[in-house]
């Protein structure tokens, strides 16, 4: 039996709100794009070092964002609405921040994307927009660049990617003749490319975030889960996939679908939820990451109680990771 420490997402604003301050200066044209990128690099470096210094075995990358992780995914898969006039192979800062904040220039006069709450947190995300003939294309190197950036500094990280089921489910359609999840087959080839590149770069583990799975889903959606996860695992090749859920308990049927899939691990929020049938984990050859530290408050945990929890779960789980209930930015 092995026990490891797993970080599923680290705060990005900086201990002195460095990112917020740099962004405000950038938007006022008081600093350059290069200055903003330098600030981001320093924050990421400090975050990785902090995790290493505190004994984290699985340090994460691609959890940093200049705005929010859903907007980053919009850019990653190239689902930029036509009104933003994106024509280049890769999404520029100009287009990125036009979607985030709107643009009132001679060349581009558009409102921002709609914003709504990220599940039941105080954080918000920009809502993806999908048309019936939506095309997807790899349009950002962000996860690859950040993995390489960490590697050059001596950190072997676990890249985090927002999963396709959550990404589509959080979006809205331009008309009512189709559902966003209908675009799954169109989207998956881009995920194949993303996971293949990360595999070639040497990622041992890749974290796929699918928090939408904690929400009540209909039978048609539930049928997609195992099939989709199996495809993602196939795309990743020799890299291992840990499917990460948080904010609530998984429905027992959805939990069963995940455990029967080909992914190598699963993260569960055990602050707001619990494992449906812990005895079922005895013969499961998967890594189980247990979110026993509350990721949604700043208070210290009762260490003795947490040790008791870990010892209890270790009786049933061969490969056990300890983590926070959700990413720490919440």
List PLM regions with ranges.
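Domain-level signal for soluble alpha/beta catalytic cores
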Residues: 1-330
């Amino acid at each position: 039996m092995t026990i490891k420490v797993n970080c599923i997402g680290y705060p990005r604003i900086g201990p002195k709100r460095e990112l917020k301050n740099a962004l405000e200066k950038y938007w006022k044209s008081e600093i350059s794009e290069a200055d903003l990128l330098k600030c981001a690099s320093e924050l990421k470096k400090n975050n990785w070092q902090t995790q290493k210094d505190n004994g984290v075995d699985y340090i994460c990358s691609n959890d940093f964002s200049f705005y929010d992780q859903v907007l980053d995914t919009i850019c990653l898969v190239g689902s930029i609405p036509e009104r933003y006039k994106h024509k280049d192979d890769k999404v520029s800062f100009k287009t990125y921040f036009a979607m985030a904040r709107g643009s009132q220039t001679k060349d581009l006069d558009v409102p921002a994307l709609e914003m709504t709450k990220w599940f039941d947190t105080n954080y918000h995300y920009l809502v993806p927009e999908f048309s019936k003939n939506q095309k997807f294309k790899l349009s950002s190197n962000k996860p690859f660049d950040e993995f390489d950036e960490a590697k050059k500094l001596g950190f072997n990280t676990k890249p985090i990617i927002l999963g396709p089921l959550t990404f589509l489910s959080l979006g809205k359609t331009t008309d009512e003749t189709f559902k966003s999840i209908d675009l799954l087959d169109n989207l998956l080839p881009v995920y194949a490319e993303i996971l293949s590149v990360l595999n070639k770069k040497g990622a041992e583990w890749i974290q796929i975030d699918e928090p939408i799975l904690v929400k009540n889903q209909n039978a048609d959606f539930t049928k997609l889960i195992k099939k989709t996860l199996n495809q993602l695992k196939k795309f990743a090749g020799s890299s291992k996939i840990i499917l990460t859920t948080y904010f609530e308990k998984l429905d027992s049927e959805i939990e069963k679908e995940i455990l029967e899939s080909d992914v190598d691990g699963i993260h569960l929020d055990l602050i707001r939820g619990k494992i449906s049938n812990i005895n079922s984990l005895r013969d499961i050859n998967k890594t189980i990451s247990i979110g026993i530290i509350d990721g949604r408050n700043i208070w210290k945990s009762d260490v003795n109680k947490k040790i008791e929890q870990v010892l209890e779960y270790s009786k049933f789980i061969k490969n056990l990771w300890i983590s926070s209930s959700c990413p720490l930015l919440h």
